[in-house]
């Protein structure tokens, strides 16, 4: 692989080269010979090379068109690998055949919208093993009552079981990012953690609750324009005190709250 390619700052590129961490990512994803792996952002192909040796099939989505011919030259095109010039935020994941494991070293500036997109198409995935900015990984895995617990925590934990696998220092990358990174695995749940009457309304409630996280639920949820009588019944009907703040509610409590307010 040509090592003279310079990382594009505009694409948030930081190329992971350290074979120790590349192997650990594949281990964390539990990539085996029967697995189809979707790699987002193969970059210079260092992780791709590890995945191709382990997986049945690797589909690599790369936004940087400079890298496509280099990746194709390195790996060729065959039954075991396909390299596409594609934007992970626009890709039609619904068109994927069967189930896939996602493995990705995500550009940090778009990691949250990509996670949301992948979660929206979770039916296509067994798991997501993602290299993220450490603080985002911590946020995803945080329990209720923690300062890092927020909308993304609830959304991910509703549909997946997150686990922080390990931290990766800046010097494992070229160029070095200014922050620590962490690999997190999200194992997609067969069913959401909570049975919901209306998943879209649940998401609206959680977004509203965390949009003003210093305020009580009573004040933060006013934007939903639920009638006052129903708001007064929340405590007696759900056991949830609207004097609490969003960060104290579990996913299950958000489910009860949303189902009642939306009924």
Regions found by a protein language model. Name each.
Residues 1-207, 236, 247, 256-263:
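Catalytic cores of RNA-modifying enzymes
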Residues 188, 206-263:
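C-terminal lobe and adjacent flexible extensions of AdoMet/dcAdoMet transferase-like proteins
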């Amino acid at each position: 692989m040509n090592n003279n390619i310079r990382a594009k700052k505009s694409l948030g590129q930081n190329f992971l080269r350290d074979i120790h961490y590349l192997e650990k990512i594949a281990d964390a994803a539990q990539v085996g010979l029967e697995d189809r792996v979707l790699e987002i952002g193969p970059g210079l192909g260092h992780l791709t090379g590890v995945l191709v040796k382990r997986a049945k099939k690797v589909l690599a989505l790369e936004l940087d068109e400079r890298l496509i011919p280099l990746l194709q030259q390195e790996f060729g095109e065959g039954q075991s690998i396909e390299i596409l010039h594609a934007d992970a935020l626009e890709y039609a994941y619904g068109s994927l055949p069967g189930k896939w494991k996602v493995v990705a070293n995500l550009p940090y500036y778009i990691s949250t919208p990509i996670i949301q997109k992948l979660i929206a198409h979770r039916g296509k995935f067994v798991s997501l093993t993602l290299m993220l900015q450490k603080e985002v990984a911590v946020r995803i895995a945080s329990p209720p009552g923690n300062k890092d617990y927020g909308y993304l925590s609830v959304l991910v934990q509703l549909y997946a079981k997150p686990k922080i696998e390990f931290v990766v220092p800046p010097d494992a990358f070229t160029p070095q990012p200014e922050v620590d990174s962490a690999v997190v695995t999200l194992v997609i749940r067969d069913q959401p953690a909570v049975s919901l009457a209306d998943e879209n309304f649940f998401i609206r409630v959680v977004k509203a609750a965390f949009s003003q996280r210093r305020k009580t639920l009573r004040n933060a949820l006013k934007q939903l324009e639920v009638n006052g009588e129903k708001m007064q019944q929340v405590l007696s009907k759900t056991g949830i005190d609207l004097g609490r703040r969003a960060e104290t509610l579990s996913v299950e409590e958000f489910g009860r709250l949303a189902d009642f307010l939306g009924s």
